[in-house]
């Protein structure tokens, strides 16, 4: 690799909209994200399971085949 054309890779503070910050490596000066592992529903255990039903359920409901 040619050193003079490669971007500088350095540690950067990543800021989430929830206020959480952590350090990661990047070629950018700063990184802002909307969601991180501290506030994402999958990681916090607060996710909602919504079952609307699939195509078969909709078909049965439409033609009253329950």
From Swiss-Prot:
One of its GO terms (biological process) is translation. Pfam families: Ribosomal_L31. InterPro entries: Ribosomal_bL28/bL31-like_sf (IPR034704), Ribosomal_bL31 (IPR002150), Ribosomal_bL31_A (IPR027491), Ribosomal_bL31_sf (IPR042105). It comes from the Bacteria. Its cofactor is Zn(2+). The keyword Ribonucleoprotein applies. PROSITE patterns: RIBOSOMAL_L31. Keywords: Metal-binding, Ribonucleoprotein, Ribosomal protein, RNA-binding, rRNA-binding, Zinc. Binds 1 zinc ion per subunit. GO terms for molecular function: metal ion binding; rRNA binding; structural constituent of ribosome. Zn(2+) binds at residues 16, 18, 36, 39. Binds the 23S rRNA. NCBIfam families: L31, PRK00019.1. This is Large ribosomal subunit protein bL31. It comes from Clostridioides difficile (strain 630). The lineage of its organism: Bacteria, Bacillati, Bacillota, Clostridia, Peptostreptococcales. The gene is rpmE.
């Amino acid at each position: 690799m040619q050193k003079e054309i490669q971007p500088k890779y350095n540690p950067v503070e990543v800021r989430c909209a929830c206020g959480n910050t952590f350090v990661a490596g990047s070629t950018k000066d700063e990184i802002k994200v909307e969601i991180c592992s501290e506030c994402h529903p999958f990681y916090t255990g607060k996710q909602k399971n919504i079952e609307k039903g699939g195509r078969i359920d909709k078909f049965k409901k439409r033609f009253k085949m329950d």
